[in-house]
Amino acid sequence: MSLRYLPLLAAALLLTACAAPQPRPGEGVDVGEASSLRSLIPAAELEKAASLQYSQLKRAAADKDLLAPDNHPQVIRLRRIAKHILPNAARFNAEAKNWQWEVNLIISKQLNAFCMPGGKIAFYSGIIDNLTLSDDEIAIVMGHEIAHALREHAREQMAKNKLTQTGAAILGALVGGGELFRLGGNLMTLKFSRDDESEADLVGLDLAARAGYDPRAGITLWQKMDAASNGAPPAWLSTHPGGEARIAEIERNLPAVMPLYEAARKPR
C-alpha cells in the first residue's frame, strides 16, 4: 500500500467506530466490533513483545523474592478464579483459545493488576490485601483486565499513538520493517482511553457473571476503591471516571448480566 493513502485509511477506520448499544436483559453486554484500527499493528509482534516484558517482570520480581510461588494461597486463589473465567474468553476474541495464559502474583503494596496481550495476567498483592477483595471482586478486576487483552486495546492504542506521534509514514515503515515497539513504550503501563476502560468494565462484568461470580461485586469494589483513594482513581485505572459514575454504569448494565450469573452460579 502506498504510504500516502494511510491517513485516509486511518480516518475511514475511525469512522467505523460506533456507540455501545443499550444493554439487553439476560443476553450479556454488547460492545460491538473491536476497533478496526488495531489491524494497523501486527498482533503476533505485539504478543511477542508482551511475552518478553512479562518474562522480564517475573524475573525481576523473582530476583527480589517478590514473585509469589505456585503454592502461595493467593496464587492458587487467582488461578482458580481465572480457570472459571477463561472458558468464556473466546466469546469476545476467538484467538484467546490459542493464547498461552499465565497468572502470577507480585508481592507489592501497589493497587495494581493487568493482563497483557496474549493473556499474561499479573496481580499485585496490595490490591487484594489492602482492599480485602472477595472472590467476586477479584473476578471483576480480573475480568476487566482480561477484557483489555480480548478487545485488543493495547494494539488499538499503539496504532493511535503511532498515527499521532510519529506520522503515517513512520507507522508504515515500522509495520513493514518489523521494528514495531522501539518507540512503543512499556505495555504494563500503557494508558487506555476512557472509552476502552468503560468497554473493559462491561466485558469484565459479563465474563465474571458467566463464570458464576456476582457482577454486583463491581459496586462494592468501587466503593472500596473510592475509600482507599479518597474518591480519586488509583494509578491502576487513572483514566477512568470516578466511582459514582462507574457504579451507575454497572447498575445500568446489571439486567444484562444478572441472569447469566444466576444460571452459572454454583457453590465454590
Enumerate the predicted regions with their spans.
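Sec-dependent N-terminal signal peptides
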Residues: R4-A12
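A Zn2+-metalloprotease active-site environment signal
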Residues: Y5-L6, C18-R268
